[in-house]
Each structure stands twice: as C-alpha cells, then as structure tokens.
Amino acid sequence: MLVLSRKKNESIMIGDTIEIKIISIDGDQIKLGIDAPRNLDVYRKEIFDAIQEENRLAMKSQSDWASMKQLFQTSKEKRDDQ
C-alpha cells in the first residue's frame, strides 16, 4: 500500500484521469474530492462491500433456483411416466 501525506487543497493523481483532492480536515475527519471519468464507478468501501455481498447472495439464489427447477422437472417426469 502506498501511503502519502497531503495537506488541505493538495491532491494526488491516479493515472491520467483520476484526481483525489483534500477538501477539508476537521479533527479526525477528512473530506475528499474525487474527480474521475463518469464511466468509472466510485464507492465508499462499506457500500462497495455491501454491493459485493448482495451480488454473492444473488448468485447463490440463482443456483438454488436452478436446483429447484431440476427437482420439479424430475418430479414431473416421474408423474408423466406413471
């Protein structure tokens, strides 16, 4: 991890298109300004983690639905054979 020190109104660049600027410092809280291309999603870490968890749960649900569908098809085939 790269660790940098910056003061108010100073910034860092990530690549050619992303600028992160220190807007204000108030005690232990720092306000950042992020200038990035619109096609790049920018999230707070806790929001990003929540989105990832929801995606994992959705994938599990899709897998569960596929298993349930197979179960019902097998059951229907058995009834049709009788």
Swiss-Prot record:
The keyword Cell wall biogenesis/degradation does not apply. InterPro entries: CsrA (IPR003751), CsrA_sf (IPR036107). It is found in: Cytoplasm. GO terms for biological process: bacterial-type flagellum organization; mRNA catabolic process; negative regulation of translational initiation; regulation of bacterial-type flagellum assembly; regulation of carbohydrate metabolic process. Its main location: cytoplasm. One of its GO terms (molecular function) is mRNA 5'-UTR binding. Keywords: Bacterial flagellum biogenesis, Cytoplasm, Repressor, RNA-binding, Translation regulation. One of its GO terms (cellular component) is cytosol. Belongs to the CsrA/RsmA family. A translational regulator that binds mRNA to regulate translation initiation and/or mRNA stability. Usually binds in the 5'-UTR at or near the Shine-Dalgarno sequence preventing ribosome-binding, thus repressing translation. Its main target seems to be the major flagellin gene, while its function is anatagonized by FliW. Homodimer; the beta-strands of each monomer intercalate to form a hydrophobic core, while the alpha-helices form wings that extend away from the core. This is Translational regulator CsrA. It comes from Brevibacillus brevis (strain 47 / JCM 6285 / NBRC 100599). The lineage of its organism: Bacteria, Bacillati, Bacillota, Bacilli, Bacillales.
